[in-house]
From Swiss-Prot:
This is Eukaryotic translation initiation factor 4E-1. Its main location: nucleus. Residues 1-22 have a biased composition (Basic and acidic residues). MRNA binds at residues 65-70, 97, 115-116, 165-170, 210-214. The lineage of its organism: Eukaryota, Viridiplantae, Streptophyta, Embryophyta, Tracheophyta. Component of the protein complex eIF4F, which is involved in the recognition of the mRNA cap, ATP-dependent unwinding of 5'-terminal secondary structure and recruitment of mRNA to the ribosome. Recognizes and binds the 7-methylguanosine-containing mRNA cap during an early step in the initiation of protein synthesis and facilitates ribosome binding by inducing the unwinding of the mRNAs secondary structures. Key component of recessive resistance to potyviruses. (Microbial infection) Susceptibility host factor required for viral infection (e.g. potato virus Y (PVY) and pepper mottle virus (PepMoV)) by recruiting viral RNAs to the host ribosomal complex via an interaction with viral genome-linked protein (VPg). Expressed ubiquitously in seedlings, roots, leaves, sepals, petals, anthers and dehisced pollen, with highest levels in pollen, maturing anthers and roots. Strongly expressed in susceptible plants but not in resistant ones.
Amino acid sequence: MVDEVEKPASLEESKTNTREVEEGAEEVIESDDTMSSLGNPCKAMKHPLEHSWTFWFDNPSGKSKQAAWGSSIRPIYTFSTVEDFWSVYNNIHHPSKLAVGADFHCFKNKIEPKWEDPVCASGGKWTMSFSRGKSDTCWLYTLLAMIGEQFDCGDEICGAVINVRVRQEKIALWTRNAANETAQVSIGKQWKEFLDYNDSIGFIFHDDAKKLDRAAKNRYSV
């Protein structure tokens, strides 16, 4: 565990020490200089995360009814230190600024945000819902909890996704072994605590979602 990443709320303090904001606006990346600046050597010591993570973006303008699900998802950037996370995060659009239909993912490196990925295939997801434009802080704290290894069953976590829709935004936390009820319930309870989220949340198996689509029912609730 990284000392600087103690809990979601405290990580906000490190934001001021690693901010490199450059304005602009195009899809997710706000600055054309963002990726190039991340490649430059940094004189200050960087603080490694336990895992490397990759941001993925599903561009709504690139989707078509004929295209296979997930065909428009593309990786944006992989980071492995606290400082690189903030450099990326501070230069991308937050959920409230994303176009309707956009899906933005953050998954452990080498795990693709798809049901078909071998690590995700037997998993499932917890989901939280928010009014349109109200998920920015909870999305950030979800990311901080994940990359800071705040979950007791963190090895179960694959990643998280924010879905931006017309009337609402949803954050889902993907896990790898849906049948492990003890681990999934622990993750769901801790996630609610980290975000101070009071509504009930449900866990759906990916297998159920593939077979039943929107008719899939929650297997666990907290």
